[in-house]
């Protein structure tokens, strides 16, 4: 017990929170953001089902509202609040942007590129960086970008996941982390096989984490112990969608799977025709997925035999975005299409610079797209 205690102290010291150091490099911004946002963005794409935009509609012919460059290139998916959005930038920064004007309110330097995108919770922004050997997880103040705390970790490229007062992160070295959000203390570290590129998923039964070693794990929330594991037909590179007791995911070998929790048994397995790099989404009782060859899949969650597919004649690595008025998809060549879910016909399209690597998002009728040059474009 004494040896274990000393080892725990050494580990805790090495992965210690470094709030003083990060505060010393902070430069106050000339513009301030809001003190808080009422709507949270706690997981990749906003909700566990990836259906944050399902009640939204677009105008019949959306027009460019603004275009913003906030650095060399935006990486990852944005976190969208009611008045602002937050993005990670390739030149080691996080930026807060006014949704009405596209004006950058502040930029904060961080230790590496934010590949997985930020999370937004009330008066805080959470980000993790890709860097070796000094990657960090941060909590930033929404109003001015000032670091509240930072914690050293291995390099992180996967999106984070927030669950109450707990933050989960998966590293490039295949380690899952649980952190406390009040001060950034690491509660546990669980080494897994393979790198973690997909967002971890907090579920009622534990934390689901997929690795590039073609394995899906279910970890105990309290300890990080492995409760179940499943060999997947290919790697899972985007966060699974969670709906009740099921996970829905796509793999690099072109399979779409429904996985039952907590045993991680396969409820159904459907051939998508090509690799699936983007995250599936669940809207009401239907699963939406987009294969690399541009095939849009519309799958009744409980009747997969009734699945329909539409060849959209695009190449895609981003997942689809279900709306009330259709399904948004984006291509590696820069096209954004609004697709009719009944016929597969394109009701609207716009050409941007490609590749578009993250799903387009809509809030309050405003379409937000991260263009291929790393700029942010808003349409209404």
For every predicted segment, state its role:
Residues 1-25:
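Sec-dependent bacterial lipoprotein signal peptides
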